[in-house]
Amino acid sequence: DTADSFMRWMLLGPYHPEVKQSVARIQRMHNSVARSFPESFSEEEDFIYSYAVFTLTSARMREVAGAPPRPQTELIAVHHFWRDISEQLHSTSGRPSTYPSTVEEMVSYADEIESREYPPTPDGRIVSNAMIDQFSDRYFRGRLKPLGRAMILAFVSDRVQHRQDVVRANPVLVYAVRKAFRAYFFLQDHVLPPTRRPFSVLLQSEEWKDMRKEWRTAEVSANPNRSGLNREPIKTGAEAGR
């Protein structure tokens, strides 16, 4: 539900009435689950690290692909966006007190967490591989499935892959993916014209609604036994290391 809401949050802004209502609903869901599993949403660090990942992913992808960075002002804007969201969506301990005040501090925050030594966990392996497989099953079915795994792991550090004990991707495909993204970023920056259809208009279109409906139907068909919040959350990353 949180991921499904991201686009509208970004388009409307963190203090738009619809966004505040949506964020409050997610916070209530977290609080409800926390009554049964209090450790799942109690750590401020887990939330701030997630916001750091959301902020830095695009810049890190460009760096790994060997593409020039986007203007720093874009990173600052994203950093401010998640800062404002973090005031509304946070751990059960309350609003964050350690949110990095600058992009540079956020980079250091993420690097420090990712440099810690956590032993691989069975749960981490299960969750990581399941997420990669879900992506591959949706976009790269059949013989193309290894390409889906390579597309994800091309931008995941060796340290994190080792920690989560994921099934490694074909190194040749990883190399090809990085080169393809470098070319894409070049085209995006220097060749392709800006889109003439605002993304906000696309999200309101029947075309987008039909696409989302098709995705959800495919997910249910692929996993008819999928359940909601009635199972114990699986711990990964920093949470699993504690």
List each language-model region with its residue ranges.
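Mature, function-bearing regions of proteins
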Residues: 1-242
